[in-house]
Protein backbone atom coordinates (compact mmCIF):
# COMPACT_ATOMS: atom_id res chain seq x y z
CA UNK A 1 0.00 0.00 0.00
CA UNK A 2 1.01 3.55 -0.58
CA UNK A 3 1.26 5.31 2.82
CA UNK A 4 3.15 8.30 1.52
CA UNK A 5 0.10 10.62 0.98
CA UNK A 6 -1.28 9.79 4.42
CA UNK A 7 2.04 10.37 6.18
CA UNK A 8 2.67 13.55 4.20
CA UNK A 9 -0.73 15.00 5.12
CA UNK A 10 -0.24 14.13 8.80
CA UNK A 11 3.18 15.77 8.85
CA UNK A 12 1.79 18.82 7.09
CA UNK A 13 -1.00 19.19 9.66
CA UNK A 14 1.41 18.60 12.54
CA UNK A 15 3.88 21.25 11.39
CA UNK A 16 1.13 23.76 10.64
CA UNK A 17 -0.17 23.50 14.21
CA UNK A 18 3.25 23.38 15.89
CA UNK A 19 4.11 27.13 15.91
CA UNK A 20 0.72 28.06 17.36
CA UNK A 21 0.99 25.50 20.13
CA UNK A 22 4.53 26.62 20.89
CA UNK A 23 3.40 30.24 21.21
CA UNK A 24 0.41 29.23 23.28
CA UNK A 25 2.59 27.10 25.55
CA UNK A 26 5.03 29.99 26.03
CA UNK A 27 2.21 32.37 26.92
CA UNK A 28 0.71 29.92 29.39
CA UNK A 29 4.07 29.35 31.06
CA UNK A 30 4.69 33.11 31.47
CA UNK A 31 1.13 33.57 32.73
CA UNK A 32 1.61 30.75 35.22
CA UNK A 33 4.79 32.39 36.53
CA UNK A 34 3.01 35.72 37.04
CA UNK A 35 -0.13 34.08 38.42
CA UNK A 36 -2.28 35.52 35.62
CA UNK A 37 -3.77 33.40 32.87
CA UNK A 38 -4.22 35.19 29.54
CA UNK A 39 -6.84 34.20 26.96
CA UNK A 40 -5.74 32.34 23.80
CA UNK A 41 -4.54 34.63 20.99
CA UNK A 42 -7.10 33.40 18.46
CA UNK A 43 -10.11 34.86 20.32
CA UNK A 44 -10.14 38.53 21.30
CA UNK A 45 -10.79 39.16 24.98
CA UNK A 46 -14.10 40.83 25.69
CA UNK A 47 -15.23 41.87 29.16
CA UNK A 48 -18.30 40.07 30.44
CA UNK A 49 -21.38 42.20 30.91
CA UNK A 50 -22.43 42.63 34.49
CA UNK A 51 -25.98 41.43 34.92
CA UNK A 52 -27.96 41.68 38.09
CA UNK A 53 -30.47 39.10 36.87
CA UNK A 54 -31.75 37.30 33.78
CA UNK A 55 -35.18 38.24 32.44
CA UNK A 56 -37.53 35.51 31.31
CA UNK A 57 -38.60 37.74 28.41
CA UNK A 58 -36.59 40.43 26.65
CA UNK A 59 -39.88 42.08 25.66
CA UNK A 60 -40.25 43.15 29.30
CA UNK A 61 -38.33 46.43 29.00
CA UNK A 62 -38.61 47.28 32.69
CA UNK A 63 -36.99 43.97 33.60
CA UNK A 64 -34.22 44.40 31.02
CA UNK A 65 -33.56 47.92 32.32
CA UNK A 66 -33.36 46.65 35.90
CA UNK A 67 -31.23 43.57 35.19
CA UNK A 68 -28.61 44.85 32.73
CA UNK A 69 -26.44 47.24 34.71
CA UNK A 70 -23.99 48.45 32.08
CA UNK A 71 -26.36 49.23 29.20
CA UNK A 72 -26.61 52.86 28.16
CA UNK A 73 -30.29 53.61 27.53
CA UNK A 74 -30.84 56.07 24.68
CA UNK A 75 -34.09 58.00 24.33
CA UNK A 76 -35.33 58.04 20.75
CA UNK A 77 -38.56 59.71 19.62
CA UNK A 78 -40.34 56.36 19.28
CA UNK A 79 -39.08 54.43 22.29
CA UNK A 80 -36.24 53.87 24.73
CA UNK A 81 -33.55 51.74 23.10
CA UNK A 82 -30.80 49.81 24.89
CA UNK A 83 -27.46 50.79 23.36
CA UNK A 84 -24.75 48.17 23.34
CA UNK A 85 -26.86 45.09 23.93
CA UNK A 86 -25.52 43.31 20.85
CA UNK A 87 -22.15 41.65 20.55
CA UNK A 88 -21.93 40.47 24.12
CA UNK A 89 -20.23 37.16 24.73
CA UNK A 90 -22.54 34.37 25.87
CA UNK A 91 -21.61 31.53 28.09
CA UNK A 92 -22.67 28.04 27.07
CA UNK A 93 -26.14 27.12 28.19
CA UNK A 94 -27.33 23.74 29.31
CA UNK A 95 -30.37 22.01 27.91
CA UNK A 96 -32.16 22.79 31.18
CA UNK A 97 -31.85 26.51 30.40
CA UNK A 98 -33.15 26.03 26.86
CA UNK A 99 -36.26 24.17 28.00
CA UNK A 100 -37.43 25.81 31.24
CA UNK A 101 -40.07 24.19 33.38
CA UNK A 102 -43.59 25.37 32.68
CA UNK A 103 -44.21 26.25 36.33
CA UNK A 104 -41.12 28.43 36.65
CA UNK A 105 -41.66 29.95 33.21
CA UNK A 106 -45.10 31.26 34.15
CA UNK A 107 -44.30 32.17 37.74
CA UNK A 108 -40.95 33.96 37.63
CA UNK A 109 -40.30 37.27 35.90
CA UNK A 110 -36.53 37.02 36.23
CA UNK A 111 -33.79 35.06 38.01
CA UNK A 112 -31.29 36.89 40.19
CA UNK A 113 -27.57 36.32 39.73
CA UNK A 114 -26.94 36.44 43.49
CA UNK A 115 -29.33 34.82 45.96
CA UNK A 116 -28.54 37.41 48.66
CA UNK A 117 -29.64 40.37 46.51
CA UNK A 118 -32.95 41.17 48.23
CA UNK A 119 -33.78 44.13 45.99
CA UNK A 120 -33.50 41.95 42.90
CA UNK A 121 -35.50 39.16 44.50
CA UNK A 122 -38.26 41.60 45.51
CA UNK A 123 -38.33 43.06 41.98
CA UNK A 124 -38.71 39.65 40.36
CA UNK A 125 -41.43 38.53 42.78
CA UNK A 126 -43.30 41.86 42.69
CA UNK A 127 -43.23 41.80 38.90
CA UNK A 128 -44.95 38.43 38.94
CA UNK A 129 -47.73 39.73 41.17
CA UNK A 130 -48.18 42.93 39.18
CA UNK A 131 -48.52 41.06 35.90
CA UNK A 132 -51.04 38.66 37.42
CA UNK A 133 -53.25 41.52 38.56
CA UNK A 134 -55.41 42.58 35.64
CA UNK A 135 -57.45 45.69 34.97
CA UNK A 136 -60.58 43.62 35.44
CA UNK A 137 -59.67 42.98 39.08
CA UNK A 138 -59.09 46.70 39.59
CA UNK A 139 -62.47 47.53 38.10
CA UNK A 140 -64.13 44.93 40.35
CA UNK A 141 -62.64 46.64 43.38
CA UNK A 142 -63.83 50.01 42.10
CA UNK A 143 -67.37 48.72 41.57
CA UNK A 144 -67.48 47.31 45.11
CA UNK A 145 -66.57 50.75 46.44
CA UNK A 146 -69.53 52.28 44.57
CA UNK A 147 -72.57 53.84 46.22
CA UNK A 148 -75.43 51.60 47.34
CA UNK A 149 -78.53 52.02 45.19
CA UNK A 150 -81.14 51.82 47.95
CA UNK A 151 -81.76 55.58 47.96
CA UNK A 152 -80.97 56.53 44.36
CA UNK A 153 -83.56 54.41 42.54
CA UNK A 154 -83.87 52.62 39.20
CA UNK A 155 -81.27 54.71 37.38
CA UNK A 156 -78.54 53.60 39.76
CA UNK A 157 -79.58 49.95 39.50
CA UNK A 158 -79.58 50.16 35.70
CA UNK A 159 -76.14 51.78 35.76
CA UNK A 160 -74.79 49.00 37.99
CA UNK A 161 -76.24 46.37 35.65
CA UNK A 162 -74.55 48.01 32.66
CA UNK A 163 -71.24 48.15 34.53
CA UNK A 164 -71.66 44.49 35.53
CA UNK A 165 -72.17 43.54 31.87
CA UNK A 166 -69.08 45.54 30.92
CA UNK A 167 -67.08 43.76 33.59
CA UNK A 168 -68.27 40.33 32.41
CA UNK A 169 -67.41 41.28 28.84
CA UNK A 170 -63.95 42.47 29.90
CA UNK A 171 -63.48 39.23 31.81
CA UNK A 172 -64.46 37.15 28.75
CA UNK A 173 -62.09 39.16 26.53
CA UNK A 174 -59.20 38.82 28.98
CA UNK A 175 -59.82 35.07 29.29
CA UNK A 176 -59.78 34.65 25.50
CA UNK A 177 -56.58 36.68 25.27
CA UNK A 178 -54.96 34.56 27.99
CA UNK A 179 -56.08 31.39 26.21
CA UNK A 180 -54.65 32.58 22.88
CA UNK A 181 -51.34 33.43 24.57
CA UNK A 182 -51.27 29.96 26.15
CA UNK A 183 -51.89 28.35 22.75
CA UNK A 184 -49.15 30.47 21.15
CA UNK A 185 -46.74 29.57 23.95
CA UNK A 186 -47.50 25.86 23.58
CA UNK A 187 -46.98 26.09 19.81
CA UNK A 188 -43.65 27.85 20.34
CA UNK A 189 -42.52 25.19 22.83
CA UNK A 190 -43.57 22.42 20.44
CA UNK A 191 -41.67 24.07 17.59
CA UNK A 192 -38.62 24.54 19.83
CA UNK A 193 -38.73 20.87 20.90
CA UNK A 194 -39.01 19.73 17.28
CA UNK A 195 -36.13 21.99 16.29
CA UNK A 196 -33.92 20.65 19.10
CA UNK A 197 -34.63 17.02 18.23
CA UNK A 198 -34.05 17.78 14.54
CA UNK A 199 -30.68 19.40 15.35
CA UNK A 200 -29.66 16.42 17.47
CA UNK A 201 -30.53 13.99 14.68
CA UNK A 202 -28.07 15.68 12.30
Curated annotation (Swiss-Prot):
Signal keyword on record: yes
Pfam families, alphabetized: Endothelin
Origin: domain of life: Eukaryota
GO CC annotations on file: basal part of cell; extracellular space; rough endoplasmic reticulum lumen; Weibel-Palade body
An annotated Gene Ontology molecular function: signaling receptor binding
Annotated S-S bridges: 53-67, 55-63
Classification via InterPro entries: Endothelin, Endothelin_toxin_CS, Endothln-like_toxin
Subcellular location: Secreted
Region (Endothelin-like): 110-124
Signal peptide positions (record): 1-25
Gene Ontology biological-process entries: adenylate cyclase-inhibiting G protein-coupled receptor signaling pathway; artery smooth muscle contraction; axon extension; axon guidance; axonogenesis involved in innervation; blood vessel morphogenesis; body fluid secretion; branching involved in blood vessel morphogenesis
Expression by tissue: Highest expression in the adult is in lung. Lower levels found in heart, kidney, brain and intestine. In the embryo, expressed in outer and inner pharyngeal arch surfaces. Also expressed in endothelium of dorsal aorta and arch arteries, and in epithelium of pharyngeal pouches.
PROSITE patterns for this protein: ENDOTHELIN
Alphabetic keyword roster: Cleavage on pair of basic residues, Disulfide bond, Secreted, Signal, Vasoactive, Vasoconstrictor
Entry-linked SMART domains: END
Protein's job: Endothelins are endothelium-derived vasoconstrictor peptides. Probable ligand for G-protein coupled receptors EDNRA and EDNRB which activates PTK2B, BCAR1, BCAR3 and, GTPases RAP1 and RHOA cascade in glomerular mesangial cells. Also binds the DEAR/FBXW7-AS1 receptor. Promotes mesenteric arterial wall remodeling via activation of ROCK signaling and subsequent colocalization of NFATC3 with F-actin filaments. NFATC3 then translocates to the nucleus where it subsequently promotes the transcription of the smooth muscle hypertrophy and differentiation marker ACTA2.
Listed PANTHER family: ENDOTHELIN, ENDOTHELIN-1
Family of the protein in this entry: Belongs to the endothelin/sarafotoxin family.
Record-given protein name: Endothelin-1
Organism of provenance: Mus musculus
Amino acid sequence: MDYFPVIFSLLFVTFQGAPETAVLGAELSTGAENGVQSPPPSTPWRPRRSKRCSCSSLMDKECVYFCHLDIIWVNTPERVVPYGLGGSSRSKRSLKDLLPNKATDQAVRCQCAHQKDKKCWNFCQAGKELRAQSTMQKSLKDSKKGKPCSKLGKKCIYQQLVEGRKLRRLEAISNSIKASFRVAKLKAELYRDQKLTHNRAH
